[in-house]
Amino acid sequence: PLRLVGSEMCIRDSNQLVVRDMVSSQSLSSLLSTLLYILGFTLAIEAAGMGIIFLGIHGTMDMTVREELAFSAFHSISAFCNAGFSTLPGNLGNEMVMHGHNTIYITISFLIILGGIGFPILVNLYETVTYEVKRIWHHYIKGNKRMRRKIHLYNLNTRIVLIMTAILLIVGTVVIVVLEWNNAFAGMSPTDKWVQAFFNATCPRTAGFSSVG
């Protein structure tokens, strides 16, 4: 019985630690507020993505403003959730977006990346950026020299994920450019080719986004 109790306690403690790591909360008693924080964080990123996509397509795709907003919201959510669904025939290889809409491809690519690296990594990045902004503000704007830079801003998990993500994206982009420069990307400008290569190097994270065959 004691062994069973001990095992149950170990499992329970282990599960609590896993949940705490997943929601990046210092106390499980604040789970609800943490989940609301995650929801708000997610909606903020998706709203930013929606806004950028909307600005990129506004007045260029023969849609009403309502349709443009719906298109932007759907693709922002689909990208951040790594769903990969598109409302366009032919996915994002549709002629309506293939030319002159690099902003869409870049925005969707970064939404895919942010949605794929995980919430704890996003929080660590957010905290790091926030700290650096405050440090620069106090050091250079207000002239307060006492606020020193923290040595360990990124935790080990964040470093590993970011490094591996960068390596995979860089290698994937270069390989796709080399293989498809005069094939699937024939007729495109050099800028379009690099954007399409980056987008298609990012897309394997999702279930369905594509722009070339």
Task: Annotate each predicted stretch with a short phrase.
Residues 3, 7-213:
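Membrane-proximal intracellular helices of multi-pass ion channels
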